[in-house]
Each structure stands twice: as C-alpha cells, then as structure tokens.
C-alpha cells in the first residue's frame, strides 16, 4: 500500500488574502444589427418601393387612359388610300376639304365599301391631328376633295387654329411620353 498508482485529487483553494472585486456591468454597444433584422428591413424597404412603383404606374395608367387611342398616320393612310387615292399625294395626305367626313360616309354607303363609320372617323382623326398635316396648314394652301380637285384655300384664321392645335398636340405627346416612360420602367 505504500505505492499509490492512482493520482490523488486535491482541491485547489484560493488564498484568503485575495477577495473578489465586483465590477460594474459592462455595457456593450452593438454597432451592427443582427442579420435577421437587416434582412427584415431590406424586405420592408423593397416592399415599400414596389408599392410606391405600383401606385405610380396605376396613376400613370389612369392619366394615359384619357387620351384617345388613334391609329398611326400610316395605318390611317392605308385604310383610306385604296378607295380615295385623290386624298393623298403619294403616301402623304393632302389637306382635306371641310365636311369631307359626310361626303366619305355617303360614298361608303353608295359604293358598299367595307369600312365602318368608326374606322373611317378614327382614320380621319389620325390624319387631321397629325403633326405633318397641321404643319402643312399654311395660309393660301389648297384643300382637296375626294377626287383630288382643289375646293378652297386655307385662311389666316385656320392657320392660327392649326398652330394652336399643333402646340397642344406636341404638349400632349410630351406628357404621354413621360407617362409611358413611367409605365415602362421596372
């Protein structure tokens, strides 16, 4: 028994001369928020941006809806040219005589042309509201009938009206382009 094979366990005790010093609670300032909080904030910001963009798009869509959707000038020319080639100089529309819509509607009824009143009206609006047509309305220019004959000349008042109308159409086109840009952005 003199030899011990197993180590003897002893308790290490602190000396009584040292008393533990109680320190204040340390305050740790966290400079970066936790990852879950950052992710949650990003998702909230993204949802807010998407909601704002959706509201902008809805507002732009509503603002665009007040404008009449007319066919392009080329489509309007292609609609009318086969039946009334006298109204055009090549593919360029001539200045139309006053009251030509009624004449064309009568012609449609007489010749049984497969054009609805709506298509005819929209084609005439597209042509007469185009920038090239309004720019051509200068004092002294000729107006033409369905056969291509001169019926009357443009007066000073009509030229002034065309200039005012052209300004209005250009202003509307600018506004439409801005609204369309809002709709097209992501």
Curated annotation (Swiss-Prot):
Pfam families: FinO_N, ProQ. The keyword Transcription applies. Disulfide bonds: none annotated. One of its GO terms (molecular function) is RNA binding. CDD domains: FinO_conjug_rep. Residues 1-20 are annotated as: Disordered. Keywords: Conjugation, Plasmid, Repressor, RNA-binding, Transcription, Transcription regulation. The keyword Transcription applies. InterPro entries: Fertility_inhibition_FinO_N, ProQ/FinO, ProQ/FinO_sf. Belongs to the FinO family. One of the components on the FinOP fertility inhibition complex, which inhibits the expression of traJ gene, which in turn regulates the expression of some 20 transfer genes. The transfer genes are responsible for the process, called conjugal transfer, in which DNA is transmitted from one bacterial host to another. RNA-binding that interacts with the traJ mRNA and its antisense RNA, finP, stabilizing finP against endonucleolytic degradation and facilitating sense-antisense RNA recognition. This is Fertility inhibition protein. The lineage of its organism: Bacteria, Pseudomonadati, Pseudomonadota, Gammaproteobacteria, Enterobacterales. The gene is finO.
């Amino acid at each position: 028994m003199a030899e011990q094979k197993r180590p003897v366990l002893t308790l290490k005790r602190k000396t009584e001369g040292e008393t533990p010093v109680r320190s204040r609670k340390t305050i740790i300032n966290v400079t970066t928020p936790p990852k879950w909080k950052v992710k949650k904030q990003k998702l909230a910001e993204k949802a807010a941006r998407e909601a704002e963009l959706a509201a902008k798009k809805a507002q732009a869509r509503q603002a665009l809806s007040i404008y009449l959707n007319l066919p392009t000038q080329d489509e309007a020319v292609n609609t009318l040219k086969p039946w009334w080639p006298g109204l055009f100089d090549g593919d360029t529309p001539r200045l139309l005589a006053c009251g030509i819509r009624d004449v064309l509607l009568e012609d449609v009824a007489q010749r049984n042309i497969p054009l609805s009143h709506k298509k005819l009206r929209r084609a005439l609006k597209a042509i007469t509201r185009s920038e090239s047509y309004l720019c051509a309305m200068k004092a002294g220019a000729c107006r033409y009938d369905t056969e291509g004959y001169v019926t009357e000349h443009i007066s000073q008042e009509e030229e002034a009206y065309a200039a005012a109308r052209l300004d209005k159409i250009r202003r509307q086109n600018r506004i439409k382009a801005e609204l369309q840009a809002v709709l097209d952005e992501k």
